[in-house]
Amino acid sequence: MARILNIEIPNNKRVVISLTYIYGIGRTSAQEICAKAKIDENIRVKDLSEAQLSAIREIAKEYVTEGDLRREVSLNIKRLMEVKCYRGIRHRKGLPVRGQSTKSNARTRKGPRKTVAGKKSTK
């Protein structure tokens, strides 16, 4: 297994697919990295030379990835919550942030149903 940015990427997959195993690098970023390093996207990682791997490592260092990216995202969410803007309030309450309807759906964000006892009818 090749090691790029302290992440083990699979050897038997194409370079573009293997690079997406790094948090913060998707298909487009992986294609850009391959283009800058002048490496064919269809080559398997196991077939790369050490010079090509080091070229990929140098280019990938320019991207915000892994722990730094996770920290940046969490700080952005914390900032929204501190400012108490609408998005921050939705994050705090654990509700959908991007305007989705919550009357009938949004179970993923809200969690399992909390049943409330209905009113008992008197006879």
From Swiss-Prot:
Parts forming coiled coils: none
Biased composition (Basic residues): 106-123
GO aspect biological process, one term: translation
One family name in Pfam for this protein: Ribosomal_S13
Ranges where the record places region Disordered: 94-123
An annotated Gene Ontology molecular function: rRNA binding
Gene Ontology cellular-component annotations: cytosol; small ribosomal subunit
Family of the protein in this entry: Belongs to the universal ribosomal protein uS13 family.
Function: Located at the top of the head of the 30S subunit, it contacts several helices of the 16S rRNA. In the 70S ribosome it contacts the 23S rRNA (bridge B1a) and protein L5 of the 50S subunit (bridge B1b), connecting the 2 subunits; these bridges are implicated in subunit movement. Contacts the tRNAs in the A and P-sites.
Self-association state and partner proteins as the record states: Part of the 30S ribosomal subunit. Forms a loose heterodimer with protein S19. Forms two bridges to the 50S subunit in the 70S ribosome.
Name listed for the protein in its UniProt record: Small ribosomal subunit protein uS13
Taxonomic source organism: Mycoplasmopsis agalactiae (strain NCTC 10123 / CIP 59.7 / PG2) (Mycoplasma agalactiae)
